[in-house]
A protein has these predicted regions:
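N-terminal positively charged helical leader segments and presequences
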Residues: 1-79, 257
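Structural motif
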Residues: 14, 26, 48, 70-72, ...
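Fold-independent oxyanion-binding glycine-rich loops
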Residues: 19-20, 31-32, 54, 94, ...
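RNA substrate-binding interface of SAM-dependent RNA methyltransferases
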Residues: 76, 80-176
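Active-site/ligand-binding-proximal alpha/beta "capping" segment
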Residues: 171-214, 220-225
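Structured adenosyl-cofactor binding patch, chiefly the S-adenosyl-L-methionine
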Residues: 209-257
Length: 257
């Protein structure tokens, strides 16, 4: 048996597996995982692999047996516990397929806890394919070294989402119209509204007047400005997540908030 590797190099492959892991056990990989390791990475016996399970954390394993279409890994031990996930949801109207996939990938990288596609009056995106969106989330988490995956909710109508909105969760929504009034500072909103939060991003063309009224009527809603320029939906989503993570999340940038 090969010697147990030290902590894996940064170049070690890293994969999500949908099974609870523990040190001192073995795991068999086949399908897409095996194809990636065997055909793409050209992995060899004894090579290190990082695994995470979205349950307990990240583990170091090494290859003990190779087949044509599968391989066996021995799990040496845990390298990190599952991360504490900032309590931020992203509620976003679907846009063109590739750009919405990009939003999901980047929201995962930035650390959100939950992603909820929202159907609005002006939503023009194609039908949501949950399996493909989840695949984008997993790939993003593997690459950015997250140990937790966001929860992916089914497509929900805006009206239904607002009717069922949790009483203890702030809903920050981007409204480009309020910047000219001098109101809607995101920093001020973060100072005044600590606790569980969500960011609501509308479709290309924004929310309808009726939808704006419904959102503003929600006691937990907080209108915010993302600056003097009109942002595309995908840009707005990433900008808003970044501002929240800097002020209230785990970036520890605005420590005075």
């Amino acid at each position: 048996m090969p010697a147990t590797p030290a902590y894996p190099p940064h170049s070690a492959p890293r994969l999500y597996v949908d099974v609870e892991l523990s040190g001192g056990t073995e795991i068999r990989l086949d399908g897409s995982h095996a194809h990636y390791l065997l055909k793409v990475m050209r992995i060899k016996q004894g090579d290190p692999v990082k695994l995470f399970d979205d349950r307990t954390g990240e583990y170091l394993a090494h290859v003990t047996a190779l087949g044509k279409r599968d391989l066996i890994l021995s799990i040496d031990g845990k390298t990190r516990d599952r991360e504490a996930v900032p309590d931020l949801w992203l509620c976003a109207a679907p846009i063109k397929k590739d750009r919405f996939n990009w939003i999901v990938e980047k929201a995962t990288e930035l650390g959100v806890a939950r992603i909820m596609p929202v159907q609005t009056e002006r939503t023009q995106g194609q039908a949501i394919k949950p399996d493909k969106l989840r695949a984008h989330m997993i790939e993003a988490a593997e690459q950015c070294e997250r140990t937790a995956l966001p929860t992916l909710e089914p497509l929900t109508k805006l009206t239904a989402m607002l009717e069922q909105w949790p009483a203890d969760r702030h809903l920050f929504f981007a409204d480009e119209r309020i910047h000219a009034t001098g109101e809607g500072s995101f920093r001020s909103a973060l100072v005044a509204n600590a606790g569980p939060a969500a960011i609501l991003i509308g479709p290309e063309g924004g929310f309808s007047d009726a939808e704006n009224e419904m959102i503003r009527a929600l006691p937990q809603s907080v209108a915010v400005s993302l600056g003097p320029r009109i942002l595309r939906a995908d840009t707005a989503a990433i900008a808003a997540i970044s501002l929240w993570m800097a002020g209230r999340g785990d970036w520890n940038v605005m420590k005075s908030l």
